[in-house]
Amino acid sequence: MFSNPGAFFLGTLVPSEQMFIKTVLESARVNGYNKIVEPCAGAFAMSHLAVQTGFAPQQIEASDVSMFTSIMGYAITGQSLEALELHADGFTDEELLNPAIALYAWKYLSMIKDAEKEYFYAHLIDMERRRDEHIAVLQQQLDRAKSILHGMSYRALDMWEHLEEVIDDPHALVIPNPPTYTAGFEKYYDT
């Protein structure tokens, strides 16, 4: 799994789902919608698709309550991770202010609980041996996402609170992406 850390940033939508959502986004844009709201942003798949269909990043609001997404969202929007108050065994608080290291720590520590399985143990060993390489790849992926989405807004915010804020905006297209679909990442929440 971690042999391709870039997979974190590709989203979980299959091509047919991406095409459908792109069609919806394109139609919304030409019909007067000027704001995309992505609660439960995950890996920001909807935000990426919105940019691909002509929305400016400044027209995108995203939110989530997961640590993975919040680290990414803060990195993309240039916010300090200090507000997240990250603490993790084996990492200094100062290290965890670096988004790539914070994502590495999140993944590494979430895999430890499955280390008795050979598959996960092998990945943990790889992560330890090639720590700097994994962090560098994560940084490249964060830089790529930032180059595409910089200008959007992100908050660590509950979906219901975000929906309440935008429910009466007639120009906002709300596309929540909760982790309840077949390819979802419910396991991200088991840490």
Kindly give the residue locations of the regions a language model identified.
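Class I S-adenosyl-L-methionine-dependent methyltransferase catalytic core
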Residues: 1-191
